[in-house]
Amino acid sequence: MGSSSSMWTVCVILASLASAALCANPRRPVDVQFGRNYVPTWAFDHIKYFNGGSDIQPHLDKYTGTGFQPKGSYLFGHFSMYIKMVPGDSAGTVTAFYLSSQNAEHDEIDFEFLGNRTGQPYILQTNVFTGGKGDREQRIYLWFDPTKEYHRYSILWNLYQIVFFVDEVPIRVFKNSKDLGVKFPFDQPMKIYNSLWNADDWATRGGLEKTDWSKAPFIAAYKGFHIDGCEASVNAKFCDTQGKRWWDQPEFRDLDAAQWRRLRWVRQKYTIYNYCTDTKRYPHISPPECKRDRDI
């Protein structure tokens, strides 16, 4: 009887740990071919396809970059992409993965990877626009070389928070702070945009480092193309799910303790700019949503 009881206890503990692990992170992404979810939007000839469309390589030259977007628009969900950044001298280039709506007071959720001179690290800039207002930049260095291997970059967006992930590590959280008078993206469907383009007027050292076109073409690589969201192309009200979708469940309304520790690690080790702590920009009081930032 004692042996059976002990075995039962072990099973319960293991089941609890497994359940906690599942709750801690978004559902496992389903990787599909490019054409399943996406279409090119400009400079079609600057995208090359491999492995039957499972992998693509956007190209940037002195004439143009390129981009792609999904076939539908989405309101809430989990969106991810495996990306390998432009290697070598990538100064002046920007590789972008972001969500955006389509009107003047638009919402937007940005990953922007800012290229640099050979040997210097990439900078990952994130930003959040709500009701047409942005200016919420945060910048970090990555703890790996993003040009060597594919890494997954993902966005979890629900009615409670927006979480930016690098692989399984949360690097930023933007909480719903409507009670503080801060707008939150909740009623404008967004498309997922991806692009490789020249931004040497600002991208590297504030525009001091220009794109060296003798190094062109600049080539990034994408795969994965995961979308698990509520398609709202026809009727956005359909996506007002009131807790019916997996991303609305209680375990996804805040980070768990382990995720907060990982986020704190990123903040302490790799953050190089956070608008919430920019006293030159905000000499008297930081923006109200910064009150929800546990590390400040």
From Swiss-Prot:
Q: Where in the cell is it found?
A: Secreted, Cell wall; Secreted, Extracellular space, Apoplast
- Where is the GH16 domain positioned along the sequence? 24-222
Q: Which GO terms describe its biological process?
A: cell wall biogenesis; cell wall organization; xyloglucan metabolic process
Active site (catalytic residues) = 108 (nucleophile), 112 (proton donor)
Q: Where does xyloglucan bind?
A: 112, 125-127, 135-137, 201-202, 206, 281
Specify the domain of life of the species encoding this protein: Eukaryota
Q: Which Pfam families match?
A: Glyco_hydro_16 (PF00722), XET_C (PF06955)
Is Cell wall biogenesis/degradation a UniProt keyword of this protein?
yes
Cite the entry's keywords alphabetically.
Apoplast, Cell wall, Cell wall biogenesis/degradation, Disulfide bond, Glycoprotein, Glycosidase, Hydrolase, Secreted, Signal, Transferase
Glycan attachment positions: 116
The EC number on file is 2.4.1.207
Where is the site Important for catalytic activity? 110
Q: Name one GO cellular component term.
A: apoplast
Q: Where is the signal peptide?
A: 1-23
Class of this enzyme: transferase
Write out the PTM section of this UniProt entry. Answer: Contains at least one intrachain disulfide bond essential for its enzymatic activity.
Which SUPFAM superfamilies has this protein been placed in? Concanavalin A-like lectins/glucanases
Which InterPro entries does the annotation name?
Beta-glucanase/XTH, ConA-like_dom_sf, GH16, GH16_AS, XET_C, XTH
What protein family does this chain belong to? Belongs to the glycosyl hydrolase 16 family. XTH group 1 subfamily.
Q: Write out the function statement from the record.
A: Catalyzes xyloglucan endohydrolysis (XEH) and/or endotransglycosylation (XET). Cleaves and religates xyloglucan polymers, an essential constituent of the primary cell wall, and thereby participates in cell wall construction of growing tissues.
What is this protein's name?
Answer: Xyloglucan endotransglucosylase/hydrolase 1
| Record organism | Glycine max (Soybean)
